Amino acid sequence: MSEEMNDQMQVRRQKLQELYDLGIDPFGQKFDRTSMATPLHEDWDQFSKEELHEKEEESHVSIAGRLMTKRGKGKAGFAHVQDLSGQIQIYVRKDQVGEDQFAIWNSADLGDIVGVEGVMFKTNTGELSVKAQSFTLLTKALRPLPDKFHGLQDIEQRYRQRYLDLITNQDSTQTFIKRSKILQEMRNYLNQQGFLEVETPMMHQIAGGAAARPFVTHHNALDATLYMRIAIELHLKRLIVGGLEKVYEIGRVFRNEGVSTRHNPEFTMIELYEAYADYHDIMDITENMIRHISEKVLGTAKVTYGEETIDLESKWKRIHMADAVKEETGVDFFNIQSDEDAKIAAKEHGIEITDNMKYGHILNEFFEQKVEETLIQPTFVYGHPIEISPLAKKNAEDPRFTDRFELFIVGREHGNAFTELNDPIDQRARFEAQLVEKEQGNDEAHEMDEDFIEALEYGMPPTGGLGIGIDRLVMLLTDSASIRDVLLFPYMRQK
């Protein structure tokens, strides 16, 4: 911390003591606020200076917030007070608030939290303002805010000290307000469709439901190893077995993997499951739900992301993974019949693979390396290979593939869904194949889950399921480049 900063803090501490000496509590009490900044602008900006003067008696308001600017000397001054909705100017005169309150005004610093009672008026320049009749210090700020003209220039500091980012960056505040509304509209849509919101455990005895490395913890009283959940899936499917036919959960998921602009070790997902549905039905739900959210939160289904305009309004494209690869590379995986032929095709097209990869893995590598980033407009890619889809139902017409889809927008995966595998015998065989992969070095392969197989043996109806990463969806709908911009407190390396 610089000497200048230390000096500013010392001055604020001195002012704090002066307030105590005057018998004033610098950390205040309840304040009855009647109005907020933006609604005041909406209600009163329409009136002229003269009209406001005539309406003075009916324009009495009480506001509270943080001092963001302050100017003026002598017997009067102006400031901008910021609350959650925005900013409004206040005008403080000694002959209006009295000598004692004006002394408090004079000693107030940027960042202090204040309460103001007064009436609405417009200045000579036409700016709507509150003419203070009472000025109250509610909280003394002991640290100065970042430079008001530059805000928080250090991106890392914005993430580490999100509270400062929210104070100084209204765009950031609006992003998190939109995030809250996105979740609200997601719930509204699903509840209207007859889904039941449930809560399931975050600590599991087996890390299942996804191909990911888990965080491991230990339960001392039970002397048991537990895993922070890497997916919500398997518990929700147990509920489908139990007769809860349309369920969803919005919750935190943990994966012990890399940190990037698109990945955080803990993130929020929605998973939903509907009995008697298949992956085509889930495509419809996904498309309609995201379109609904965009229209309700943004007022439009045409979304700007970076330099792209994303059309969520028109019917979304649907394409088989093998067809998508053929369109982009000319390689027809429908006609490739063996692992060796797939490896030859990979070598010819410069696709990076490993020796233990089979047909399905190689098709997926073709897709990820050549196709994925080209899918800018909303696209459902379906027909994933069985090797990479241990929980999805085999396709009835071609058992090399599954009834699964992923949603891609702006070259990123935004959802994963399938017609769920409800055959316990097939499910056991898939888990056993995953165990072989684990022995061959795939540390993200699925564990055997005997309890889940037992649940399937009681009978799970044909079911469609979906998982969506909330953080990526919020990134899309708020035009945010990094996942850290949509997480209030993203994970950061220790200093």
From Swiss-Prot:
Reactions that this protein is recorded to catalyse: tRNA(Lys) + L-lysine + ATP = L-lysyl-tRNA(Lys) + AMP + diphosphate
Cofactor(s) essential for the protein: Mg(2+)
UniProt-listed InterPro entries: Aa-tRNA-synt_II, aa-tRNA-synth_II, aa-tRNA-synth_II/BPL/LPL, Lys-tRNA-ligase_II, Lys-tRNA-ligase_II_bac/euk, Lys-tRNA-ligase_II_N, Lys-tRNA-synth_II_C, NA-bd_OB-fold
EC number from the UniProt entry: 6.1.1.6
Recorded GO CC terms: cytosol
Cofactor stoichiometry and binding remark: Binds 3 Mg(2+) ions per subunit.
Keywords, in A-Z order: Aminoacyl-tRNA synthetase, ATP-binding, Cytoplasm, Ligase, Magnesium, Metal-binding, Nucleotide-binding, Protein biosynthesis
Residues the entry annotates as binding Mg(2+) 1: 406, 413
One matching Pfam family: tRNA-synt_2
UniProt record, GO biological process: lysyl-tRNA aminoacylation
UniProt binding sites for Mg(2+) 2: 413
Location in the cell: Cytoplasm
Subunit structure: Homodimer.
Similarity field: Belongs to the class-II aminoacyl-tRNA synthetase family.
Listed PANTHER family: LYSINE--TRNA LIGASE, CHLOROPLASTIC_MITOCHONDRIAL, LYSYL-TRNA SYNTHETASE
Protein name: Lysine--tRNA ligase
Record organism: Staphylococcus saprophyticus subsp. saprophyticus (strain ATCC 15305 / DSM 20229 / NCIMB 8711 / NCTC 7292 / S-41)
Organism lineage string: Bacteria, Bacillati, Bacillota, Bacilli, Bacillales
Gene: lysS
